Amino acid sequence: MLKKFNNYFSLFLILIYLSGCVSAVIGGVATVGIATVQERSLKDSAIDLKLELQLQKKLFEASKDKLFAYVDVIIIEQRIMLIGNVESQEVRDLATKISWEVSPKIKAVLNELTIGGKTTLVSEAKDVRISLSLSGLLIGDVDISDINFSHSVSKQVIFLIGIAKNDDELNQVIYHARTIKGVRKVISHIILKNDKKRM
């Protein structure tokens, strides 16, 4: 899995956030070119980034051994998706509780954390291969605006989240995920651009 890299990167962003430089990060990411194809507004993108930094910080402070090192966080339009592996139902529930407490702006917490059964290096390598394959397929498909979708892979299960412009795009993203060799399951939290959940 890409968890360790993502978590180290998040730590870097947390340090930037604590030093008051988060606006520089947001400014660097929010380019005009991205704004023309991204279903999320620049305001929502900025809010999501700030919320992710805050949540990663809280998970780290709560117990880095139990939560932070094994949990991926993806936030799109204030909908949080938690992916990874934790040691008990208590820790899983705590992750949900902490997520809701981050901000009143949170609209949903999609807790996809599994309990027990630590991953092996072989399993993590498979997850990385699957993740890279999916990214390549989405980028290479001219009918998909890949910037509107995020994913995480845990134990060869692909978790999708994002905003599709229509049913065709949504189904095509899921199709690509399912066709990758070695994928055990695909779980989608993708919504359509006209979904009431976005209101």
Predicted regions and their residues:
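N-terminal targeting leaders
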Residues: 2, 6, 17-199
